[in-house]
């Protein structure tokens, strides 16, 4: 019973429904993050550099900092890899029967999404400020094309929104999973029943329900000189007229 809808996934071993899977908000956000990561990687690697007419090597359009362009391409590449891994992990979630393993998977999803959200937020402002600070030499004869660099900035912003949305839904799934797994189950409810009810009395009055527990109640004695024994009445039974274990 604990595996049913544990941490946003259904019963372990359930059939995979791709139509339902690709309609999930987390999957949609990760697909968007994958696409924007590809755009960032391609835009910066192909159009984030400029070769001045008097230089041998090209310079990065983001403030002439080669490390910034390398950082942008690396972030785009790892964002694509991370989105693919998390999509596959979400697709395999229904096959995981262990609730603690599901908890660790959702927690890893939350941590990775939050890290990429912070990285893209920092990267967006960094790329924007450094592209604005790029200055062209007056004697440079080669025209500068900044369209790809600007697409890189836009894709960094959109990646921030996509990973932020994925992190939000991962956090919601983690919180809902914690609440579901910490709710008292039937055994805990049964353990809270007072001992005078457990000893000698069954729920429902017969074998229906949980069944007869202990020995039958003592019969009243009518021998001469002996006071009649009174049978203690059990408290009201919330499981009366219930079948099985009430699940």
Swiss-Prot record:
Keyword Transmembrane among record annotations: yes
Lipid bilayer topology: Multi-pass membrane protein
Gene Ontology annotations of biological process type: regulation of exocytosis; synaptic vesicle transport
Keyword annotations of the record: Membrane, Transmembrane, Transmembrane helix
Lineage: Eukaryota, Metazoa, Ecdysozoa, Nematoda, Chromadorea
Transmembrane segments: 25-45, 69-89, 105-125, 151-171
Tissue expression notes: Expressed in a wide variety of neurons and is expressed weakly in the non-neuronal distal tip cells. A punctate pattern was observed in the ventral and dorsal nerve cords and the nerve ring. Weak expression is seen in neuronal cell bodies and commissures.
Domain MARVEL, chain residue ranges per copy: 21-175
Annotated compartments: Membrane
PROSITE patterns registered for this protein in UniProt: MARVEL (PS51225)
UniProt protein name: Synaptogyrin homolog 1
Region (Disordered), start-end ranges: 206-247
Domain of life: Eukaryota
Polar residues bias locations: 220-247
Family: Belongs to the synaptogyrin family.
Residue stretches in coiled coil: none
Gene Ontology CC annotation, any one: cytoplasmic vesicle
């Amino acid at each position: 019973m604990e595996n049913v809808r544990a941490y946003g996934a259904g019963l372990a071993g359930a059939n995979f429904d791709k139509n339902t899977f690709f309609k999930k908000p987390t999957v949609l956000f990760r697909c968007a993050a994958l696409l924007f990561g590809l755009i960032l990687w391609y835009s910066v690697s192909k159009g984030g550099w400029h070769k001045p007419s008097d230089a041998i090597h090209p310079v990065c359009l983001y403030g002439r900092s080669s490390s910034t362009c390398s950082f942008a391409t690396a972030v785009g590449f790892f964002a694509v890899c991370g989105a693919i891994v998390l999509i596959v992990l979400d697709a395999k979630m229904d096959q995981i029967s262990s609730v603690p393993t599901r908890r660790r998977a959702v927690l890893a999803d939350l941590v990775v999404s939050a890290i990429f959200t912070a990285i893209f937020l920092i990267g967006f402002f960094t790329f924007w400020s450094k592209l604005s600070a790029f200055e062209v030499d007056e004697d440079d004869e080669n025209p500068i094309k900044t369209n790809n660099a600007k697409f890189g900035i836009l894709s960094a912003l959109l990646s921030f929104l996509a990973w932020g949305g994925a992190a939000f839904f991962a956090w919601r799934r983690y919180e809902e999973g914690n609440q579901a797994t910490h709710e008292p189950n039937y055994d805990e409810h049964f353990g809270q029943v007072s001992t005078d009810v457990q000893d000698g009395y069954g729920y429902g009055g017969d074998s229906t329900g949980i069944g007869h527990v202990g020995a039958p109640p003592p019969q009243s004695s009518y021998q001469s000189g002996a006071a009649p024994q009174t049978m203690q009445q059990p408290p009201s039974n919330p499981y009366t007229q219930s079948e099985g274990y009430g699940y």
